UniProtKB/Swiss-Prot annotation:
Cellular component terms (Gene Ontology): cytoplasm; plasma membrane
Catalytic activity: (S)-dihydroorotate + a quinone = orotate + a quinol
Protein name, as recorded: Dihydroorotate dehydrogenase (quinone)
EC numbers, comma separated: 1.3.5.2
Classification via Pfam families: DHO_dh
Protein's UniProt keywords contain Zinc: no
InterPro entries reported for this sequence: Aldolase_TIM, DHO_dehydrogenase, Dihydroorotate_DH_2, Dihydroorotate_DH_cat, Dihydroorotate_DH_CS
Listed GO biological process terms: 'de novo' pyrimidine nucleobase biosynthetic process; 'de novo' UMP biosynthetic process
Gene name as annotated: pyrD
Co-factor remark: Binds 1 FMN per subunit.
Annotated positions binding FMN: 62-66, 86, 142, 175, 216, 244, 267, 296, 317-318
Amino acid sequence: MLWPALRSVLFQLDPERVHHLAHWALHRVPLAVARARRPASIPALAVRCMGLDFDGPVGLAAGFDKGDVALPGLFGLGFSHVEIGTITPRPQPGNDRPRLFRLPEHRALLNRMGFNNEGMEACARRLAALPPAARLGPVGINVGKNKVTPNEDAAADYLACIERLHPYADYLVVNISSPNTPGLRQLQERDALDRLLRACVRHLAERAPGKPLLVKLAPDLSPEALDEAVDVAIAAGAAGIVATNTTLSRAGVERHPRAAEAGGLSGAPLERLATDVVRRCYARAAGRVPIVGVGGVMDAEGAYAKIRAGATLVQAYTGLIYGGPAFVGRVNAGLARLLERDGFSTLSDAVGADHRQGGGKAAG
């Protein structure tokens, strides 16, 4: 196993520098190599969701590719879909460095990146230049508002991103749950969320009828606020719920020297909380829209827990950082074994299984 040795070397370097090195390498993977190296798909894991076909449930969460568009390299790792972003209308540098920290004892990351990206125009140019063959699966684009945009004007930022980027996206995600943009999470409140999502859904429907628009929620909402957000999102026409973003909680890492740093926590400490949020969202949605489970997907067991809790798809980022290039292949192989163990013919049969077997009581 070469990855543990390489990881120990890379973890001696600044986390953001390693991120850029990884992106540089992935950007240079030829399409032919990506196709050849991509793990073989497993028929039982195929998913059809929101009118799109996924050759497996495991996608790359937003935050890794912020518009550099290293799609062949990322798909070559085995991801069934890649979510680019978060992208804002105008370029912005994000928060001051250092802003990304590893907590290796806990298999976690803590970040306060702040939507650093080169803006929607740069992202659109790169996606437009990409050959169609480079899309080895669905591509999502996660959009947000610029830091300097007040919340009362936030809708204009989201609409601008949808307008510019929708031709290149198989689906779009409205990100209102990052803890690293001041005031952003206030957009999850009932009236603000309703106004924003209705405007976004209408705008996209006028330009690309049938193209899915999802909303990404925080794991730190109260049970009542989460139920309300799911209801509002569905009533506004959202095609799905992405649950969840990073957490402000430090449960499980309280004694770590980095615990006092500002930012959102991801990785293994988030796994149970995020799965509980998936479970509650699934119960509240009652089959009306799919749930995409994100947060603490570090292995097949974690992915399977979210699927049984109600996630049709799952996404990972921190799991890739700790698991290395073979991460997705291991998760998919493990999922296939777990499905067989529990008597499921397909992954879709396992979605929400805990609810049907009496284990789906909503958290809270």
